Amino acid sequence: MKRNKIFTLILIVVSMAMGFSSCIGNDDDYNNNQKPTIDPVTYSYKDIYLQTSMTAYPFFSQVNSSVEKNKNFMISPLGMTEVLTMLVHGANENTAAQINKVMNTPWILPAHIMDAMKSLNDFLPKADSKTALAIANSQWIDEGYDVKNDYIKNNIDKLDAETLTQLLSTETTKDDINSWCARKTNGLIKDFLKSPLQQNTRMVLLNALYFKGQWKYKFDKK
């Protein structure tokens, strides 16, 4: 990845600012560069969920190693998968291969991963009437930055990503992103960004998850 990138992870919101060559310029599609060793159609949605869920352990370990000792933290492997799903179908060649490796889906086409995530996002919020779950995605594009329409449309159609175009490195955008995070997390995350994004930021992908449920085994309050 030759372009400058920003990767920030805080609690259950995942943000990535990036510039990838496949999102701009020619219409070369990542799918044309993929050469799965087995027919990707044989992968069921369940297979894809299992593959991506296996990233939770190394993800937790990586975050845990960077967190202050004895300090509580929370991560969302699902949130990471949502963002990487938006990301991978806009990447080519080595970049796409690296993202697929992180997702543990090296032989699965991005289009099939997106279909699986769409199905999961449709199902999970309605899976349990006693549990509240909201999943939100958004893509923020720097004003004047040329992003392929197909890429934008796929994120909208498959992952219901809100799409906003504005100058990203401004105080206004920082406030807008923080407001978005606050709305989508029911006010639990209000100050995701402490300062404006860097001037070389061209695109931001965001995922937010809000969950409220009852513990099957409650903690001792003491």
Locations of the language-model features?
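Post-signal peptide N-terminal segment of mature Sec-exported envelope proteins
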Residues: 33-50
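Non-catalytic, conformational "gating/processing" segments within enzyme and secreted inhibitor domains
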Residues: 110, 116-222
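C-terminal motif of bacterial Sec signal peptides marking the signal peptidase cleavage site
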Residues: 18-22
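Bacterial signal peptide processing site
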Residues: 24-27
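Bacterial N-terminal signal peptides that target proteins for export
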Residues: 1-10
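Active-site-surrounding "flap" and adjacent substrate/cofactor-binding loops of secreted or lumenal enzymes
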Residues: 89-123
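Mature N-terminal segment immediately following signal peptide/propeptide cleavage
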Residues: 53-64
